[in-house]
Amino acid sequence: KKTILALFLVLNFFSYAQDQLNLNYYLPQGITYNPSVPTPKEVIGHEVGEWHVTHDKLMFYMQTLAEASDRITIENRGATFEGRPILLLTITTPKNHQNIEQIRQEHITLTESNSNVDISEMPIIVYQGFSIHGNEPSGANAGLAYAYYLAAAQGPEIEAMLDDMVILMDPSYNPDGLQRFAYWANTNKSINLVADNNEREYHEVWPGGRTNHYWFDMNRDWLPVQLPE
């Protein structure tokens, strides 16, 4: 009886923990957020981490953020072999967005040996890409909360940070692999989380979500640069 009671309490604890999941868990405390910028749940229908985000939901949220925030512009750089968009977000202050071409040209000038550019007021460029392997999904899922923070956080700290940098954000390096993995994991997920490594959810069928459409490991394309991703 004691064993059954203990098992019952453990199951209820994990069910309660799942029910308490919300965006505040991931965000810095003591910061106000622009209410006109939608949270991930308001757009994709679930909290960050409640389900593995599919690529279509990830892209929909990023496009929605770009429409809601003057800190974000979005560019479609092409499509994967399965036709999924390859998006790039540019995140900075509205002032930097107005001068983005000038900032780009100044950074190009820095590569010239005889350049004489004053870098004291030049914003730095930060490139961030997420989940190059589709079944390493924490990056793409964290990207939901991260992009929301950059778009909606208010106060002098975030304003100063974005004034000093231009963030280029690729929410998903490997859209086809991410979609393949998310479908598998969500399809085989239990209503209550299961930590047992033998659970079907954790064992994808071959080829899994690591690779792109042609089962190519994206880490092998840094030098040849032959794939659209």
Indicate where each model-derived feature is located.
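Acidic/histidine-rich, surface-exposed loop or edge segments in extracytoplasmic proteins
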Residues: 31-50, 128, 213-217
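Sec-dependent N-terminal signal peptides
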Residues: 3-12
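A non-catalytic alpha/beta surface segment that caps or lines the substrate-entry region
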Residues: 55-96
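Surface-exposed loop and adjacent secondary-structure segments within mature catalytic domains
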Residues: 19-35, 89-93, 103-107, 113-123, ...
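The substrate-binding groove and active-site-proximal loops of carbohydrate-active enzymes
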Residues: 46-52, 132-136, 214-228
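Sec/Tat signal peptide C-region and signal peptidase I cleavage site
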Residues: 13-17
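Divalent metal-coordination and catalytic microenvironments
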Residues: 54, 83, 131, 169, ...
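Short HxH-centered metal-ligating active-site micro-motif
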Residues: 83, 117-125, 129-138
